[in-house]
Regions:
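Solvent-exposed loop and edge beta-strand segments that line ligand/cofactor-binding
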Residues: 78-95, 127-144, 179-191, 230
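Regulatory N- and C-terminal appendages and interdomain linkers associated
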Residues: 1-92, 135-139
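A generic N-terminal leader/anchor concept
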Residues: 55-56, 83-88, 97-111, 116-126
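Short, conserved phosphate-binding/catalytic loop or strand-edge motifs used
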Residues: 143-147, 168-175, 189-194
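Long, well-ordered core segments of solenoidal/helical folds
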Residues: 51-69, 116-133, 162-182, 213-230
């Protein structure tokens, strides 16, 4: 049987992904710049049309389980100086950001296919997260804060109280988690970005439990600032 154009494009994508794992010393190589404009989109300067093109690509290339309840994407993940392939993760810095994008796109377009794909990806992540395959890093973009954001976003969009309870459970985990003295405090990978995220949610929730969590994390931030004479 002949491959359809869509199937052929998927096969080419998988080949490119596979070849990317052969590269080494990623940070030491730099391509010479070329004065060529690459047209990635056909939607002109319309941000929404271009976003729809990205969303359709993500929906088309999502890999679903047999029951169509969970999905993921083959992800390029940085592993030291090399690239490795794996399932998509929950961090906003990587595929959690993809999920957040799809949720927002569903709001802007009213198309449920984007939200359903985002939810399928969340369910895959939850299953592995429950099996302790993910670290609970104290970070908004590269840790537990990413899941907090995604759960809260789903709750605000769909008013699904189950996701509010999941969000609250993670807040409770933060309340009791032991913060290591050598914890990362920068905005992307550490405590400061997480505190900002929680403060933004507090603006809407006015929740005492959340406030206590913010105070706990902020005290640690102040301790680290004192250590650095900031």
């Amino acid at each position: 049987n002949k491959l359809s154009k869509s199937d052929l494009e998927k096969q080419l994508l998988y080949i490119r992904l596979s070849i990317s794992t052969l590269l080494s010393n990623l940070w030491n190589e730099r391509e010479e710049s070329v004065d060529i404009k690459i047209n990635y989109f056909n939607g002109g300067n319309s941000f929404l049309k271009n976003s729809i093109s990205i969303g359709d690509f993500l929906v088309e290339n999502a890999i679903w389980n047999d029951s169509k309840s969970e999905c993921t994407w083959i992800a390029q993940l940085i592993d030291g100086k090399r690239i490795k392939l794996g399932m998509s993760n929950y961090t906003l810095y990587e595929y959690g950001g993809t999920i957040a994008f799809l949720i927002t796109l569903s709001i802007e377009t009213g198309e449920e296919k984007y939200f359903n794909t985002a939810l399928g990806a969340i369910k895959t992540i939850e299953r592995y997260y429950d099996n302790k395959l993910y670290e609970k890093k104290l970070s908004a973009y590269d840790g537990i804060g990413s899941l907090i954001y995604l759960y809260y976003k789903i709750y605000t969009v769909k008013k699904d109280y189950n996701y509010y309870l999941k969000y609250k459970k993670l807040i409770q985990e933060l309340r009791v988690i032991e913060i290591q003295d050598n914890c990362i405090v920068d905005y992307v990978g550490g405590l400061s970005g997480l505190v900002v995220l929680l403060c933004n949610i507090y603006e809407y929730e006015k929740d005492d439990s959340l406030l206590k969590t913010i105070i706990k994390l902020s005290k640690k931030l102040l301790e680290k600032c004192d250590e650095c004479n900031l």
